[in-house]
Amino acid sequence: MPGAHAILSPSASKRWMECPPSARREALMPEESSPYAVEGSLAHRIAEVMLTAYRDLDLLPMTADDLLQVEEGTVAADLRQLQQECSEAGLDYDSIAGTVHDGYVLLVYEEYQAFRRADKDTRLLVEARLNLKSFIPEGFGSSDAVIIGNDTVSVYDLKFGKGIKVDAVNNPQMMIYALGAVYGPADDYVVHDIRMTIVQPRLAWYSRFETTFEGLTHWGKYTLRPAAAKAFEGAGEYRPGPHCRFCRVASSCRVCEAYSRALRETFQDPSDLRDDELGYVLGQLDLLRGWAAKVETRAMDLLQQGKPVGGWKIVEGRSVRKISDQDAAIERLKAAGIDLDTVLKAPELKGLTDLEKVLRKSGLQTILGDLITKPQGKPTLAREDDPRPAMTPDVSKDFE
C-alpha cells in the first residue's frame, strides 16, 4: 500500500527478528527510492490489474497483449494507463507485462481454477490488505494474492527483481502473510493446510513451502509474537549478519562496522585461508559489499549537503567527450573532403579517439570543435589530497 509503512513490516521481518533494535532506527530514516523500486511497483500494479481481470471476468488464459484488447470492464484502460507510466519512467511495458503475466499471473490463476474445481466456494484475493496486530504491534501488510478454499490457504508473493533467488521454506515474511490471511479473510473457514509460494518470473524460479494450521499458529505465538514485541520496543541486542545488507541504518551502525572490520582483520590474506574459512568468507561478501556501498552513499549525501566528512571531498568524476550533432558533423567531414568510410561506424560516426587518429588533433578541432561537448562528470568521492578541485555542492534545491 503506497504511502503507508508499518514499523515492523513483513518484508523486513528477517532483519528485525534477528536484530530487534534495528527496526526503530530504520523507522527514523527516510524511505529510499530507486529505479528498481519504480520498476517493481509498476510490475506489481500490472499483475494486480491482470489477475483481478481474470478473476472478475472469468477469462480464459490469453496473452498479455490480448488483455489490452479486452472490451469488458476496465482492464484495457487500466493497462494502457500503466503502459503510459512505464513509458514515462523509461521502462519497457511489453517486457514487464509479458514476464509478469506468463510467469506469475497465469500460475496463480491456474491454481485458483484448480481450487475451484475441488471447492466451488474458493476465493481469490488480490493485493489483500492484512491485519497483523494479533501477532505484531500495529502490524499490517498486503499479500499479492491469497487463495482460500478446499481447507487450504495459499499465499503468493511476486518478487520482480533478478538479484538472488529467495527460498520460501521457513521464510518469515511469507509466514506472516499466511498468518494474516488465516486470522483475517479466512477466519470463518476451516483451515488445515497452509501453502506459501514465492514467484520470481525474471529468474524463472518459484519456491513453495507447506505447513499445517497448527504449525503456523505455534510459530506465530511462540516465535513471531515475542520477537515482534521486543523489536517494537526497540529492545534486545544488535546482532550483525547477512541481514544487514538491506538495512537502511547499516552505514551508521557501529555494530555492523565492528563486525565488518573484524571480518577483514581476521581474514586479511586469502592465501592463508583454509577451505572451510574461504567458504565462510565468501558467504559474507554480500554483507561487506552492501555495507561499503551504504557507507559511500551516506558520505556522498553528507558532502552534497555541504557537511564535512573527515578527510574526504567530492570531485568531478571522469567524463567522456561526445559529438552533439552527428548529422552536422558528417556534413562538415564531407565538405572537408574526408573519406567517410574512415570515420563512420554504421550507423553513426566512430568515437572521438578514432576520429583523432584519422583527422589528427588539430584537424578534429578545426572541423568539429564546436560540436564536441564534454558533460560534467558524475560526482565521486576522493581523498582531500586528491589533485582534482572539490566540487561545490548545489544546496539551492533544498530551498525550492
Q: Which stretches of residues belong to each language-model region?
A:
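Nuclease catalytic cores
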Residues: 5-55, 279, 283, 311, ...
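Alpha-helix N-cap/helix-initiation motif
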Residues: 32, 165-167, 274
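A non-catalytic, helix-rich entry segment at domain boundaries
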Residues: 38, 42-126, 211
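Short, amphipathic alpha-helical segments that act as regulatory/interfacial helices
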Residues: 47-51, 178, 296
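Charge-rich, acidic-biased intrinsically disordered regions
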Residues: 64-82, 243, 250, 300-327
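Mg2+/Mn2+-dependent nuclease catalytic core
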Residues: 79, 86, 118-230
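Short, charged, low-complexity amphipathic alpha-helix
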Residues: 195, 218-287, 389-400
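Extended, charge-rich alpha-helical segments
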Residues: 290-400
